[in-house]
Amino acid sequence: INGCLVGSEMCIRDSYHTDVLMYIGTNVVGICFDVIKEKYRELVLESVKEHHEVIELSSPQLLDFCGNCLEVENNCGDLFLVMSTRAYKSYTGSQIQQIKKNYKGVIHRDLPVIERYGGGSARCMLAELF
């Protein structure tokens, strides 16, 4: 497993893919603190909220790939958040409002094959193109 190092100790509990636990955008970060070792949660929270609005993701949302989003920018400079429909449906209404406050829009598509057989979601798929 890969994770952040604090001293010489990993701060992320076992997870098959660390890129599903969080995404970081220009102004917002979506993160699942449940999978971060308890003694490091406050440190990570303070670090990310210094420059970003924080959307806390639950463990079930993590399994629905809510942390596997990607911020993209169009040629007019507008920011969008790309995710799977599975992730979109897993966000709460208040979380969607937080997202829409920070982005021009949300782009989501159904990605069942990527999510079931690829082990990732929208960000994993799109990051292969960069």
What are these regions (language model features)?
Residues S8-E9, E53-S58, V106-R109:
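General small-molecule cofactor/ligand-binding pocket signal
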Residues I99-F130:
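TerminUS-proximal long segments
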Residues Y40-S90:
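Glycine/small-residue-rich hydrophobic helix-like segments
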Residues V82-H108:
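A conserved acidic, glycine/proline-rich C-terminal tail/linker
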Residues I1, H17, C124:
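Histidine-centered active-site/metal-ligand motif
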Residues D14-N27, D64-C76, G119-S121:
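Structural signature of eukaryotic scaffold interfaces centered on beta-propeller domains
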Residues G30-V35, V82-R86:
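Short internal beta-strands
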Residues I1-G7, C11-I12:
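Single conserved hydrophobic/aromatic residue that forms the stacking wall/gate
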